[in-house]
Amino acid sequence: MPKRHPGLIPLSHDHHHGLALALRCRKQALGQIKPTGAEGLRLRAGEFLTLYAAELSSHFEAEEGILFPKMSLHVPESEELIADLMRDHENVRLAIPKLQATVGLGKVIFDLGDLLERHIRREERELFPLFEQHAAVIGADEIAEKLTNFLKLARRLD
């Protein structure tokens, strides 16, 4: 990943973990990772739930509560992208209960992996460059401090 504004580094680290999980989800659903079959799918679903609880949930909250509002306010061209990213967050949240399923779990895991990868790529390739381009206007250093503090606190409490 390209060098990022220091305030985005915690989010980019989460993205690295998310991309690795997304790849494992798709490969698991395609039977390319052992154990295959229902056992492998259950293991991967558990891994997704663990990462969601440990990182993704607080990551989404940090973006929705800190990053997205500031960007929407100061970078009007980001509004449509942010609306799409918010829908992605909601779609991930809606899929979480489906990871308990026994029927159709392969499709759920594949689709979640696909959604997560596309979402992360859009943030890294579209949203973060906009943030960096408008860093002075949106108060990037203040946002960076708020993001860092929020994520530290949220993950300490989990």
Task: Please state what every model-predicted region is.
Residues 1-158:
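Small-residue-biased structural context
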